[in-house]
């Protein structure tokens, strides 16, 4: 079997404090570079397990990313809330003509651009750092059209108190 030298623990979500649990983050066992290279569905990614959003890469979305490949060949694709570009890059692998990935996080967009370069997709995929809620009406006014629009927003609520605002946010997009 595989011998594990070290693990990077990310038990640092704010919800742990709400549940009365300690927030922890760091190495268990041997230390290693926290920026790791992974491959999924024919796409390579750099994932920063220490500084990335949550765990840095959402493994539970593997089959959704694969499903996107079936929809995008030859099309123009808009990937909203792109994070590190995983849906956008899967669209490009599938043969999308042009892909625009949008995220409000400068760090996420920087990582997405790095992942596009890693896969030789800099020409097909463009990533911009903008607020999706401001960009969508602007694209509509400019007459931009897309064959596929990917909406994978972050959670708009983490508690009952903000459900009303969350529903408003989901309706808006």
Enumerate the language-model features and the residues they cover.
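Local beta-strand N-terminus motif with an aromatic residue
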Residues: 4, 74, 145-146
């Amino acid at each position: 079997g595989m011998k594990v030298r070290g693990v990077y623990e990310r038990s640092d979500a704010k919800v742990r404090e709400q549940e009365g649990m300690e927030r922890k983050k760091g190495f268990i066992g041997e230390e290693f570079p926290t920026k790791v290279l992974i491959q999924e569905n024919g796409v390579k990614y750099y994932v920063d397990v220490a500084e990335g959003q949550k765990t840095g890469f959402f493994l539970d979305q593997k089959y959704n990313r694969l499903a996107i490949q079936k929809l995008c060949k030859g099309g123009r694709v808009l990937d909203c809330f792109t994070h590190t570009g995983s849906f956008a890059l899967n669209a490009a692998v599938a043969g999308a003509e042009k892909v625009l990935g949008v995220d409000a996080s400068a760090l996420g967009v920087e990582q997405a651009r790095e992942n596009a370069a890693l896969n030789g997709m800099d020409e097909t995929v463009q990533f911009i750092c903008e607020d999706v809620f401001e960009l969508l009406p602007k694209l509509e006014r400019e007459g931009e059209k897309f064959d596929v629009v990917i909406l994978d927003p972050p959670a708009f609520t983490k508690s009952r108190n903000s459900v009303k605002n969350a529903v408003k946010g989901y309706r808006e997009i």
